[in-house]
């Protein structure tokens, strides 16, 4: 059995980091489903495919809350945290080989480190979601899970956009929260976007 692993939300400033793993012995069924990089699919299509993927594959999902990320980033980089999450998913699935979308600039280094941690064969590559259907499937599961978490957070805290710093709506809401002095727990406080906006808010006074 082979597995694919990918993440969603690595670069967002609001919401969790989600890592998903998909294991399957029949990749052809994934190909026939039309599984491809989640960013190239509409949200509705991702939801449909996620349901189909869960029927034919074993899936594992790991969510890291903003508070947990902030705590861990006191001593680690986001890529080190991701590596730990990937290792946990690999150990849960125990595949013969795991294909991983690499956040590391040197994918071979990530492959080696994950193999040392898990004792299993790992192939880490850039844009693995475009090459391996299993990684594309993991990308879809991760993105769908993140989107659901974001919707839950919006019900609680209001519409803050996508949660990514590049989104003007997200930045505007962050500014309002910072100015009010009440920043909700869904915000990643250690992100540079937050510290930059906090400084700008102070400078405006």
UniProtKB/Swiss-Prot annotation:
GO biological process: DNA replication, removal of RNA primer; mismatch repair
Co-factor remark: Manganese or magnesium. Binds 1 divalent metal ion per monomer in the absence of substrate. May bind a second metal ion after substrate binding.
Entry EC number(s): 3.1.26.4
PROSITE patterns: RNASE_H_2
Pfam families named in the record: RNase_HII
Mutation effect (residue 164 to A): Loss of activity. Increases Km for RNA 44-fold
Compartment(s): Cytoplasm
Needed cofactors: Mn(2+); Mg(2+)
Annotated catalysed reactions: Endonucleolytic cleavage to 5'-phosphomonoester
Family assignment from sequence similarity: Belongs to the RNase HII family.
Gene that specifies this protein: rnhB
Cellular component terms (Gene Ontology): cytoplasm; ribonuclease H2 complex
Result of changing residue 143 to A: Decrease of activity. Increases Km for RNA 30-fold
Function statement: Endonuclease that specifically degrades the RNA of RNA-DNA hybrids.
Binding site for a divalent metal cation: 6-7, 101
Name of the molecule in the record: Ribonuclease HII
